[in-house]
Amino acid sequence: MYYVLGVYIIIQTGDLVQVWGDLTLMTASVFMLFTNIAYAIKLACVIQRRELIQKIIFDGDNELDGQKTKLAIQTVERYRKDTIRLVTVYFSVAFSSVFGITFSGEKDQLPLRAWYPFDATKRPAYQWTYAYTILFFIALSINAAVNLCCDVLVAALIAQCRCRLRLIAQSLRTLCDDVDVDKKGRITADSEKVVGSRVRSIVMRHQLVLAQVEQLQQCFSVPILGQFAVASFIICVTAYQMAFVTNLYRLISMASFEIAVTIQVYIYCVAGTNLTIDSDEVSRAAYECPWYECPASIRRLLLVIMVRCKRATVITVAGIVEISLDTFMSIMKASYTFFTVLQSTGEL
C-alpha cells in the first residue's frame, strides 16, 4: 500500500515539475497529487496511533453494547443506522468518481496525468502505459477504500461520542424514575442513595466521554488539518479543470469527484457540529430532570454537570479551527476565491 501510494506521488510530482508554468497542465496534475498527499498523512497518523484508536473503539463499544433499557437500545441503533447510511452514500459517490476518472480518458490520452521516463503518447508505449494505468487502478481502488475508511473512522468515533452523550442526557431525564417520594415531594432517604449513585455514575460517564473527545483530537488533529488545507485547493482546481473538459463522461466523473471531496470535508464538519449540539443537550437534560425533588448534595452534582457543559465540547484542528459547519462554509468560500483567481490568471 505504501509502495503504490509512494510511486504515484513520485510520478505525479515528476509530472508537475515537468509541466511547471503551464497552468492548465499543472492543475491537471495537482488535484490527484494533493488528494494522495492528504491520504498519506491520514494513513500515517492512523498507523502511528492505532493502539490508542483501538482503545477508544473498545471503550465506546463496551458502553454502547451494555445498554439494557429499550430507549437506550433504540438510541444506539439509530446512531448505527445513521453511520451506515453515511458510509453507503460516501463510498458510492467516491468510487463512482474514481472509476469514472480512470476509464474516461480521451483518445490518445491517459486517464490521469503522470510522469514516465519515456514518451507515453506514442504507440505501443501508450497502450502499455494505459494497460498499466488500468492495472494500477485496482491498487488505487484499494488505496481509495482505505482513504475513505480513514474519514469514516473519524466520523464514526465522533458519532460514538455523540451517542454516549445522548445516553447520558436520557439518564438525567429519567434520574428519579422508580424512586419513592414523601408527602413533601422530596425523595426518601433510601431513594437518595439510589439517585446519588446514579448521578455519580453519570458524572463518571460524562468525564469518560470528554476524555475520549480529547483523545480523538490528539489522534486526528493533524490529518484533519491536512484534509482541510488540501480540500479547498482540490475543490477549486477540479472546478477549473471541468471548465476545459469536452468529454461528457469525463465531465460527469470529475463532477462526482468534486462532490466526493466536498462530502469528505462535510462529514467532518457536520460531525463536529452535532457533537457540540449533543453536548449542550446534556446541560438541558440536567435542568429538565426533577432536581427539585433531590437534596442539596445531589443538586450540587447536577450543577457541576451543567457548569461543565457551558464550555462547548468541540474538536479543533491544531487547536486553531473548530470542526463545524461554519468551517465548512469557510472552506467552500476559500475554494471559490481560489477558483476565481485561477480563472483570472488563465485569461491573462
State where each predicted segment sits.
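Helix-loop-helix junctions within predominantly alpha-helical proteins
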Residues: 1-29, 62-158, 163, 170-189, ...
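Hydrophobic alpha-helical membrane-embedded segments
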Residues: 32-52, 144-164, 264-271
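Cytoplasmic, membrane-proximal interface of class
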Residues: 15-20, 44-50, 209, 215
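Membrane-spanning helices that line or support transport/gating and their immediate boundary helices
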Residues: 52-59, 156-160, 164-171, 278-281, ...
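Terminal membrane-anchoring module of integral membrane proteins
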Residues: 73-76, 87-93, 159, 177-348
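Membrane-helix interface/capping segments
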Residues: 46-69
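Membrane-anchoring/interfacial helices and their immediately flanking loops
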Residues: 17-18, 25-35, 39-42, 54-61
